[in-house]
Amino acid sequence: MTREEGRRAARRRAVILLYQHDVTGLPFEELIENSECAGEEVGEFTRALTDGASLDREYLDGVIDGAAEGWTAKRMAPLERNILRVAVHELLDHPETPEAVVIAEAVATAQRFCGPDAHRLINGILGAVAREREETTT
């Protein structure tokens, strides 16, 4: 498995763990243990994304709300909301990853697992977050 494939899988695992937590309320350690018992590797990058997105959830939801025209994070389906949380966290706290990669991975995850228009919403919100980030750093 290449580094990119490993990071793609780690992002998807983080989204799934956050989604499961949102829906079930189970603690992350229990969800991680269940994943590992099922033979899924929960590596360092998955844990970093999961921890960061869960600890900064309110802040990330505020960023999402600010970038989403006519939407709030609370109104979104749990899967879309958690794809955005992971991606926004990575955009803001993992500058070593190119913005285009973060956005493309989030859009691909939405295309694979969400409804037919979810990827457009996610692309638009992440594009707005990236533009805002560029404006504040220049």
Where do the PLM segments sit?
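N-terminal interaction/assembly modules
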Residues: M1-T138
